[in-house]
């Protein structure tokens, strides 16, 4: 279920929802909510980069100078997002500025839910304009660490936990009988989550994807 408000999150959990998406962004979660989440054994998907995308283009974002981002992005899209009129509209958008405040609440709630033992899965709203597939998944993982999760738990949230949350038992972990979907990295992301960017090869069903 997609939501914004804490009261709605409590209601839908009581009603039997399987998953909460887009974060609680109006209030800090309380102990009752954390306990309810654990009691129901459901999944929380923060999607904080969705919030980022609603206001970050009010000026030029830092990642516009990231070589990892620039390697694949369409330059025409960057130029469009740099447009002064577009930036001004976003700066003057009440909803955009509201989502900016909501992001702070969402980040605090990730940390509280993680410390409380709630099952957290990585997810994004990528694919829409300004929400770059691949790069925003990386950003989401990095922000989850900033919010207080350990790098290893973010990796789990992005693989095995996420697969379990959508009842996909044949993916998410490397085990006999499962799909051999994996990436090979040049540095250890458990030491620094930014190392998820050091991709050397991608494998799907045991087959290396051509570069």
Task: List where the protein language model places each region.
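Active-site core of metal-dependent hydrolases
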Residues: 1-101, 128, 148, 166, ...
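Extracellular/periplasmic catalytic domains that process cell-envelope and extracellular macromolecules
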Residues: 13, 36-39, 113-115, 175-176, ...
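His/Asp/Glu-enriched, well-ordered alpha-helical/loop segment
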Residues: 85-188
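Small/polar (Gly/Ser/Thr/Ala-rich) solvent-exposed segments
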Residues: 191
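Short aromatic-centered micro-motifs
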Residues: 202
